[in-house]
Amino acid sequence: MAQTIKRGGKGVRRATAARSAQRKVQTARQQTGSVLDSVLRWLPFSEETLHRILMTLILAAAAGLVWTVAVMAGIPALVSEQAAIIASDAGFKVSHLEVRGVNRMNEAKIYERILGQNDRAMTTLDLAALRDELNQLPWVKDARVSRKLPDTLVIDIVERTPHAVLRKPDRMVLIDDTGVELESVRADRAKGMLVLSGMGVGQRVEDLTRLLDAAPALKPQVSEAEWVGNRRWNLTFKTGQVLALPEGDETAASALLSFARMDGVNRLLGGKVAAFDMRAPDRIYMRVPGHADEVAAEKRAEEQARAEAKRAASAKSDEG
């Protein structure tokens, strides 16, 4: 009797398929390795350095995560507070205040701003915030705040320089060369200083400085400057004479320079003319006090003389 022997056909096929898959995986690994090798060859550092960089990034990310959790739990604040207490107990707290550079302003204004820092731990001082607060004072152009261990807070002040006096309806105010108002002053303190007036003149201080710089010979002779109608200047000299300038920065500077030249030749300042008007192009008008009265008196005298001559002629005709 014939016997049929069955072979494991399916097992053979599975083994063949497994070997084929293994070859594909090995081929893919070889190709991937080749690609990675190619990339690594192009990098400016070795594979070991790359591993170190990756490890550093992982550790940094982990540290950031730990710090975030700590902040959310309030741990840094507690540590900072405890450190401040330790520093204060060791004598590192604000016990003295040293102020430098104050000549004109009221030094008490600075102490008022810093008073809340007394007995505070030196480690908890916000120097930038203190500086910003001091810079809000009108007289302070700039301030620097620093620690002098163990217990002194040092304030260095750069003061603004008074430049002129702003005349307001109810008071006189010192201003610097940029128009910043410093403090109210009495009239006797304003004596000898340039006086400014007019609506919006505080925003035109630097423009006025440039205008007066156009005629250096006249600049020290100007005692007052009025900003008229938000468009032009009237200058009053120490002699009491007034010069009306035209509108426009360049036009006004040119007119002032022309006036300076005429004054150098004809000595206009200190003369009989009370007011000079240079608003019209290429000409100047002058007003002499009492001149109109003199002209009117001369005219009346001429008319009276003519009337008397006419009466005399009429009387002589009647006699004839």
UniProtKB/Swiss-Prot annotation:
This protein's GO CC annotations: cell division site; plasma membrane
Domain POTRA: 92-160
Chain positions covered by the region annotation Disordered: 1-24, 296-320
Single GO biological process annotation from the record: cell septum assembly
Keyword Cell inner membrane: yes
InterPro entries according to UniProt: Cell_div_FtsQ/DivIB_C, FtsQ, POTRA, POTRA_FtsQ_type
Annotated signal sequence range: none
Membrane topology summary: Single-pass type II membrane protein
Transmembrane segments: 53-73
UniProt keyword annotation of Zinc present: no
Pfam short name (any one): POTRA_1
Periplasmic side: 74-320
Name of the protein described by the UniProt record: Cell division protein FtsQ
Gene that specifies this protein: ftsQ
